[in-house]
Amino acid sequence: MLDAFRDSLFHQRCFPTSDPASRESLVRWVDKNLADPASHMIIAERDISPAHPLRSAPPAGTVADADAPPPPVAGFARWVRRPTPSTAPAPAPAPARDSSPPPPPPAAPEPRMVFTPDMYPAGGDATLAARVFQANYDALMQATSGRDAWFLSMLVVPREHQRRGVGTALLRYGLERADRDGWAAYVNASSEGKPLYDKNGFATVERSEFGDIVEHHMLREPEGKS
């Protein structure tokens, strides 16, 4: 699955797959997010089964089938469901004769995360990684302040699987849920990926430039519920 990152200019610079520490960092990232209950990791696999299997092909579930290598990864995405902590003012105190417990206080605002170079592998450009992730995080927090949102944390489709509907399918997974919930959808898009989001209702609310790496911070309003 890590080979899917090879076409990303940002990952080539900051997490080169030739660097063992960078590869391990990406593996840890995937493992961490697979265990995150708020994360939805969607993996698209290339169908390598023949259209008409040979009569002698072993049935599914046999030892031969279990030992077969997994299908190649055609792309993957991580969607995060981000409900906004309640910031509504507390109701007025109840009359003294009311013995019911007081309502809980409103949730505290989410503390700002700070990204530093020591958080990233030295085999890549750790300073650039910290700058990009900080800009992306700050833009996310600003664009979705006070709003529930589905956040597309990552969508990666290798070049050989592009223009086959893989990216659109991975994108629709979260957009359908955002529309069902009546929530906004948010993504930090590269210049290469931006046309896909343009076609699916996203609008750029801000952009950050890091030399030849440009991040487009994009928001999509929910469509009518079905």
Task: Locate each region found by the language model.
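Conserved GNAT acetyl-CoA-binding A-motif
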Residues: 148-150, 177-190
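Short hydrophobic/aromatic beta-strand element in the GNAT-like acyltransferase core
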Residues: 31, 39-45, 50-54, 76, ...
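Conserved acyl-donor/pantetheine-binding loop and adjacent beta-alpha core of acyl/acetyltransferases
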Residues: 55-162
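Conserved active-site alpha-helix within GNAT-family acetyltransferase domains
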Residues: 168, 180-182, 191-214
